[in-house]
Swiss-Prot record:
<dbReference type="GO" id="GO:0062101">
    <property type="term" value="F:peptidyl-aspartic acid 3-dioxygenase activity"/>
</dbReference>
<comment type="function">
    <text>Hydroxylates HIF-1 alpha at 'Asn-799' in the C-terminal transactivation domain (CAD). Functions as an oxygen sensor and, under normoxic conditions, the hydroxylation prevents interaction of HIF-1 with transcriptional coactivators including Cbp/p300-interacting transactivator. Involved in transcriptional repression through interaction with HIF1A, VHL and histone deacetylases. Hydroxylates specific Asn residues within ankyrin repeat domains (ARD) of NFKB1, NFKBIA, NOTCH1, ASB4, PPP1R12A and several other ARD-containing proteins.</text>
</comment>
<feature type="binding site">
    <location>
        <position position="205"/>
    </location>
    <ligand>
        <name>2-oxoglutarate</name>
    </ligand>
</feature>
<keyword id="KW-0007">Acetylation</keyword>
<dbReference type="InterPro" id="IPR027452">
    <property type="entry name" value="FIH-1_dom_II"/>
</dbReference>
<protein>
    <recommendedName>
        <fullName>Hypoxia-inducible factor 1-alpha inhibitor</fullName>
        <ecNumber>1.14.11.30</ecNumber>
        <ecNumber>1.14.11.n4</ecNumber>
    </recommendedName>
</protein>
<feature type="region of interest" description="Interaction with VHL">
    <location>
        <begin position="2"/>
        <end position="125"/>
    </location>
</feature>
<feature type="compositionally biased region" description="Low complexity">
    <location>
        <begin position="1"/>
        <end position="14"/>
    </location>
</feature>
<dbReference type="InterPro" id="IPR041667">
    <property type="entry name" value="Cupin_8"/>
</dbReference>
<dbReference type="Pfam" id="PF13621">
    <property type="entry name" value="Cupin_8"/>
</dbReference>
<dbReference type="GO" id="GO:0042803">
    <property type="term" value="F:protein homodimerization activity"/>
</dbReference>
<feature type="binding site">
    <location>
        <begin position="238"/>
        <end position="239"/>
    </location>
    <ligand>
        <name>substrate</name>
    </ligand>
</feature>
<feature type="modified residue" description="N-acetylalanine">
    <location>
        <position position="2"/>
    </location>
</feature>
<dbReference type="GO" id="GO:0031406">
    <property type="term" value="F:carboxylic acid binding"/>
</dbReference>
<dbReference type="GO" id="GO:0008198">
    <property type="term" value="F:ferrous iron binding"/>
</dbReference>
<feature type="site" description="Important for dimer formation">
    <location>
        <position position="340"/>
    </location>
</feature>
<dbReference type="GO" id="GO:0005654">
    <property type="term" value="C:nucleoplasm"/>
</dbReference>
Amino acid sequence: MAATAAEVAASGSGEAREEAEAPGPAWDESQLRSYSFPTRPIPRLSQSDPRAEELIENEEPVVLTDTNLVYPALKWDLEYLQENIGNGDFSVYSASTHKFLYYDEKKMGNFQNFKPRSNREEIKFHEFVEKLQAIQQRGGEERLYLQQTLNDTVGRKIVMDFLGFNWNWINKQQGKRGWGQLTSNLLLIGMEGNVTPAHYDEQQNFFAQIKGHKRCILFPPDQFECLYPYPVHHPCDRQSQVDFDNPDYERFPNFRNVVGYETVVGPGDVLYIPMYWWHHIESLLNGGITITVNFWYKGAPTPKRIEYPLKAHQKVAIMRNIEKMLGEALGNPQEVGPLLNTMIKGRYN
């Protein structure tokens, strides 16, 4: 990236940030967790700034301060949602720690000793609110995180809010980039201090903040070797194995070299998270409930003419495909690692 985004940050994003946050200090440094690695700022720009368009075109992150993408949803809070979101089921994760490490339940059979660190249940929205309020009243370590794709069970007012999103702007972005279809809008409601550990997605993402503030730390695809993802067949595929709170440098020595790109997003901000970029997301400490909606798009189709050398994200895709093919050919995901070690040791390292 990194030069381009860093240059933009140095040349003007600070002014945009001051302007966007002029009403008052919405958060302070005491609400951010401390980590061992350095970070650089992600640019904060107007959607009309040509530099913002350049960053998105180059698949580099940027915070857009004035898209009005989810303007009708800025009034959303727990009370409004409880009254209007309908009687569908919502996926709610509970954990005894602040970290919500994603896992794919369909892959749990590949690793018999795997134990998820959070539990998922399907409940009504009012049940989620009741559980949340009970936890807040009694205190303790238990935490909740609602993660649900918006679907046709929502009530009329939510539908009207959804139709009022700035689809004109985001559809133009989709068209200009040649992206595939919008695959989902994921609603995220988290407790203060919740953390989604570093992971990457295989889709383009406009991350729209609605309520509260979230800290977002991103890492480009070329830092793959610093972040040590789980194997493709593991339930935590695409997630980093490194515990950011207490890194094990003996197991993960390259983590010493990692450098993040950081921002804090508040209501109305939209963060572009490029496909294959790692992202670590945390609701600020003592910041109250956070509400976010993701806009996930399939990436652009592979060009007919491949340009060399390949980009970092293309190499990540190749590595994923190799792991998948070996798992299928061997008939046992547990044999993939030993075979790769046999291929590489003493020959390529």
